[in-house]
């Protein structure tokens, strides 16, 4: 399993770009493309998982780190680890329910059996579950490099923290890592607002919820036209009707796996 590292504490726009590009390259199936957009692999790829190490720098100069574990075929975050008390502490989402997968998370995040300790996440990985614990919806949770940096500092190596603190960190990390890897539009929102905190707009939130639908539509398009119009949202929340691949292609970096052939170019 490969680890992609991102130094949040010394991040620049170009370093963030490079980070997302390497994540996309590690995640995608090298042989699958629709209309020039790379696609993620089917459900059982090798390697199956990806690790993303995020390093924060606190105002004291101290470096704190958190490693996220992602399912390669859909970029869902399964859990994370942090160094705690000279051990590797791992945290697994409640909805990772199969014993095999839980074991995988544990051994992939913390390979050394003699120095690992568990601190489970008591809720599911879905946005509604995370928003519930954070006490507000994603539209009210600010994103940004400084926020990600300080959120890591509130959790990494810290003995105890609330579900709220943890869920806020996860909402920020999932959107700035997984969602930005899937969507160029979300990557560009982070870059446009790089040195300030920002609230995700309606288009960001809508893309996050329609990735599967968008992937299916692009995969099924004939000569660049969708079989039926795709109803999405603009940044201001107004209706955005998409009829052709070209109209949404600039916003999409990776397609979710869809079986069967598609037009490659």
Swiss-Prot record:
Keywords: Disulfide bond, Glycoprotein, Hydrolase, Plant defense, Protein synthesis inhibitor, Toxin. InterPro entries: Ribosome-inact_prot_sf, Ribosome_inactivat_1/2, Ribosome_inactivat_prot, Ribosome_inactivat_prot_CS, Ribosome_inactivat_prot_sub1, Ribosome_inactivat_prot_sub2. PROSITE patterns: SHIGA_RICIN (PS00275). Glycosylated. Glycans are attached at residue 120. The keyword ATP-binding does not apply. GO terms for biological process: defense response; negative regulation of translation. Inhibits protein synthesis in animal cells. Useful as immunotoxin for pharmacological applications. It holds the Pfam family RIP. This is Protein synthesis inhibitor PD-S2. Transmembrane segments: none annotated. The keyword Hydrolase applies. Seeds. It comes from the Eukaryota. Its EC number is 3.2.2.22. Belongs to the ribosome-inactivating protein family. Type 1 RIP subfamily. It catalyses: Endohydrolysis of the N-glycosidic bond at one specific adenosine on the 28S rRNA. Disulfide bonds join 34-262, 88-110.
């Amino acid at each position: 399993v490969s680890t992609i590292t991102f130094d949040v504490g010394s991040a620049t726009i170009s370093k963030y770009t490079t980070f997302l590009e390497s994540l996309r390259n590690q995640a995608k199936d090298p042989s699958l493309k629709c209309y020039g957009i790379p696609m993620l692999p089917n459900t059982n790829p090798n390697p199956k998982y990806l690790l993303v190490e995020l390093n924060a720098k606190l105002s004291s100069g101290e470096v704190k780190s958190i490693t996220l574990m992602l399912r390669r075929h859909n970029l869902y975050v399964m859990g994370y680890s942090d160094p705690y008390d000279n051990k590797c502490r791992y945290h697994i989402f409640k909805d990772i329910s199969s014993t095999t997968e839980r074991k995988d998370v544990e051994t992939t995040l913390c390979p050394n059996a003699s120095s690992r300790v568990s601190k489970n996440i008591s809720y599911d990985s879905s946005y509604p579950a995370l928003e519930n614990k954070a006490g507000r919806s994603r539209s009210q949770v600010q994103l940004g490099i400084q926020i990600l940096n300080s959120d890591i500092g509130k959790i990494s190596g810290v003995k105890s923290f609330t579900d709220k603190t943890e869920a806020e960190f996860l909402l920020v990390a999932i959107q700035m890592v997984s969602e930005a890897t899937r969507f160029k539009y979300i990557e560009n929102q982070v870059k446009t607002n790089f040195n300030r905190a920002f609230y995700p707009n309606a288009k960001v939130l809508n893309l996050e919820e329609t990735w599967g639908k968008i992937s299916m539509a692009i995969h099924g398009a004939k000569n660049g036209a969708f079989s039926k119009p795709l109803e999405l949202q603009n940044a201001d929340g107004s209706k955005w009707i998409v009829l052709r691949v070209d109209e949404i292609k600039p916003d999409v970096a990776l397609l979710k796996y869809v079986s069967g052939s598609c037009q490659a170019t």
